[in-house]
């Protein structure tokens, strides 16, 4: 989804944003990942978007952001944000231009207003935020590497996330698990360009993002514990998914080597687990089939009882058992069930009638 989507301006929405390097032929060095994160922070400050979490990989990045309610941004705040984005010297130059323009009276004041409005239109908009991030980083990357042209895929991905703790935490954990899945780190907090590592270091933006996701009632230690548990759960699911794929490939006769998340011992354990799951599914299916069969048989017998009572109203369980060839106790249970459903009525002397 591109930055033309109207949801990009819908206030109080949470977005999972992803963008990849075009053709995945370039890989970001460590210093370039640092530069990208710095641009992300500056763009978020300028646009008013709140960073909840991030992870910058070698050829793509993930961001979890909150688009807050738009607020009125005065001249001083516009200049402050512009300084964050462009540098303090650029902001001072603009402020100096304002002074010169205003000497021209109303026409100059109108020019100031137009400039301020042009900056305000770039704020509180996910599309504008992503445009700044991608465009600014491309310019820096091209300058540093002697490259020209586009760096990113044309369209970034924007997936809406329910603004609810569990959904946001699951998305954030998915983002933080990227380095483990890619074998770029061997611990959840061991990847420097992840907001989880920043949270563990006490980074203010990362801590505030985790607090928004988990709730202000939790301490940092409690958030750390809850997030670690969620990451462990997701990692286990990922390992099982990869094990299932390897086992399917091997069963089909293909050479399927292990990856960094699996071992032969884990594959054997996973195979036993999958077989247990398969057997349990078969057992439940058989139970359901038996239950459905029993239900169908009961329906048939109920119809036969109704037919018998139509021919001979007032028959009791013994009379009906002789007609149907069933045990008296079975017929009586059927009659009681039918009475509860309102299909038959029970007389004072033990007989039954169709309702």
Which residues make up each language-model segment?
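Short Pro-Cys-Gly-centered "Cys-loop" motif that presents a nucleophilic cysteine in a tight turn
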Residues: 1-58, 66-304, 310, 322-323, ...
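Proline- and acidic/polar-enriched loop/turn elements at helix boundaries
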Residues: 56, 187, 333, 350-351
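A generic structural motif
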Residues: 61-64, 351-352
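Short, cationic-aromatic polyanion-contact patches
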Residues: 295-302, 316, 346-355
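Residues within the helices of the helix-turn-helix
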Residues: 307, 318, 336
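Flexible coil/turn residues that form the inter-helical turn or adjacent wing/linker of helix-turn-helix
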Residues: 313
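Short amphipathic alpha-helical interaction segments
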Residues: 327-337
């Amino acid at each position: 989804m591109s930055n033309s989507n109207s949801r990009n301006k819908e206030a109080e929405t949470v977005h999972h944003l992803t963008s990849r390097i075009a053709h995945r032929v370039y890989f970001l060095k460590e210093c370039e990942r640092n530069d990208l994160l710095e641009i992300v922070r500056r763009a978020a400050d300028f646009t008013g978007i709140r960073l909840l979490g991030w992870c910058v990989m070698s050829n793509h990045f993930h961001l979890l952001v909150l688009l807050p309610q738009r607020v009125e941004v005065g001249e001083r705040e516009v200049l402050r944000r512009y300084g964050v984005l462009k540098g303090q010297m650029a902001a001072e130059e603009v402020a100096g231009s304002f002074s010169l323009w205003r000497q021209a009276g109303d026409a100059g004041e109108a020019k100031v207003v137009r400039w301020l409005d042009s900056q305000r239109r770039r704020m509180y908009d996910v599309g504008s935020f992503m445009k700044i991030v991608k465009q600014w980083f491309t310019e820096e990357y091209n300058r540093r590497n002697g490259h020209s042209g586009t760096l990113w895929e044309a369209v970034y991905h924007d997936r809406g996330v329910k603004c609810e703790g569990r959904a946001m935490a699951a998305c954030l954990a998915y983002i933080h698990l990227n380095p483990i899945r890619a074998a770029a780190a061997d611990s959840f907090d061991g990847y420097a360009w992840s907001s989880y590592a920043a949270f563990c270091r006490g980074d203010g933006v990362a801590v505030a993002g985790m607090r928004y996701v988990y709730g202000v009632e939790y301490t940092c230690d409690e958030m750390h514990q809850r997030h670690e548990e969620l990451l462990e759960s997701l990692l286990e699911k990922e390992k099982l998914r990869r094990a299932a794929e390897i086992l399917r490939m091997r069963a089909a006769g293909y050479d399927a080597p292990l990856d960094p998340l699996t071992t032969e011992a884990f594959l054997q354990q996973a195979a036993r687990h999958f077989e247990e799951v398969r057997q349990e599914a078969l057992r439940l299916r058989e139970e359901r089939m038996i239950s459905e069969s029993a239900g169908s048989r009961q329906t048939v017998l109920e119809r036969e009882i109704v037919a018998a009572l139509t021919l001979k109203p007032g028959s009791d369980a013994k009379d009906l058992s002789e007609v149907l060839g069933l045990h008296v106790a079975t017929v009586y249970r059927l009659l009681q069930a039918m009475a509860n459903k309102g299909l038959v009525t029970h007389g004072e002397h033990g007989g039954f009638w169709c309702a």
